[in-house]
Curated annotation (Swiss-Prot):
Protein name: THAP domain-containing protein 11
Gene coding for it: Thap11
Record-stated family: Belongs to the THAP11 family.
Matching SUPFAM superfamilies: Glucocorticoid receptor-like (DNA-binding domain)
Taxonomic placement: Eukaryota, Metazoa, Chordata, Craniata, Vertebrata
Annotated organism of origin: Mus musculus (Mouse)
Annotated GO CC locations: cytosol; nucleoplasm; RNA polymerase II transcription regulator complex
Predominant cellular place of this UniProt entry's protein: nucleus
């Protein structure tokens, strides 16, 4: 990493990364230098600091000074909040922390299972939705049959004036009463009333068909959802395939690193190409100069100069 890193064991502050901190070299005064080394080589830290001799490359960050900076009054580092490399490691968690954490995880899993069971109970089963659909189908068929019979009756009345259309029965047992179109040909007003009655009957049958379709609509949607199972995602970066957000971020960072490396390589290749072109131009110029000198030598030789 560029910049200076603090030489205190366990302290990784860096001048390039931590811009707000100050970094100091070891003092040249022998007494101050001894105090700095004594405090930096604190109790419990041994090894490299037993024979540590600071050089011009060693730096000490301002975190280890009272007030966060070395001054005329604060000249010796005395604050070392970080553990040294060889200090005794103290357990960060109490003895029963692991057991309590396991119990908490088990409780969370049980709560999640209960929530899933409640959701499953609230959702309607496929068998009940199928049964409701089959119950609504006869009503739809009967309404459709009523409309068809009414239309047929109107056509028959137009073809044979004065005839009587017989009463029909739908498959569900509902009586569909056709319109009595028995009128006298000479009464135009009676014929107009019969046509109006036929139109009103047709509208009533159409309204019944639409009501049956509206009632059936949500059930058909449920059946349609069951008929198209989820096939899963087509790529490995989808969250539904079990990939976590951390893995996605890691993969994206890897892709960004690869792209950055490719950009660096491309810049290097462009520089190499530019350098080769310059070299080629120089070689061509040298070749022209040699050809010119050779031609002049040939001319001089011919003329005996």
């Amino acid at each position: 990493m560029p910049g200076f890193t603090c030489c205190v064991p366990g302290c990784y502050n860096n001048s390039h990364r931590d811009k707000a901190l100050h970094f100091y070299t070891f003092p040249k005064d022998a007494e101050l230098r001894r105090l700095w080394l004594k405090n930096v080589s604190r109790a419990g830290v041994s090894g490299c600091f037993s024979t540590f001799q600071p050089t011009t490359g060693h730096r000490l960050c301002s975190v280890h000074f009272q007030g966060g900076r070395k001054t005329y009054t604060v000249r010796v580092p005395t604050i070392f909040p970080l553990r040294g490399v060889n200090e005794r490691k103290v357990a960060r968690r109490p003895a029963g922390a692991a057991a309590a954490r396991r119990r908490q995880q088990q409780q969370q899993q049980q709560q999640q299972q209960q929530q899933q069971q409640q959701l499953q109970q609230q959702q309607p089963s496929p068998s009940s939705s199928t049964a409701q659909t089959t119950q609504l189908q006869p009503n739809l068929v009967s309404a459709s049959a009523a409309v068809l019979l009414t239309l047929q009756a109107a056509v028959d009345s137009n073809q044979a004036p004065g005839s009587v259309v017989p009463v029909s029965t739908t498959p569900s047992g509902d009586d569909v009463k056709p319109i009595d179109l028995t009128v006298q040909v000479e009464f135009a007003a009676a014929e107009g009333a019969a046509a109006a009655a036929a139109a009103s009957e047709l509208e009533a049958a159409t309204a019944g068909l639409e009501a049956a379709e509206c009632t059936l609509g949500p059930q058909l949607v449920v059946v349609g959802e069951e008929g198209f199972p989820d096939t899963g995602s087509d790529h490995s970066y989808s969250l539904s395939s079990g990939t976590t957000e951390e893995e996605l971020l890691r993969k994206l960072n890897e892709q960004r690193d690869i792209l950055a490396l490719m950009e660096v390589k491309m810049k290097e290749m462009k520089g190499s190409i530019r350098h080769l072109r310059l070299t080629e131009a120089k070689l061509r110029e040298e070749l022209r100069e040699k050809d010119r000198l050779l031609a002049m030598a040939v001319i001089r030789k011919k003329h005996g100069m």
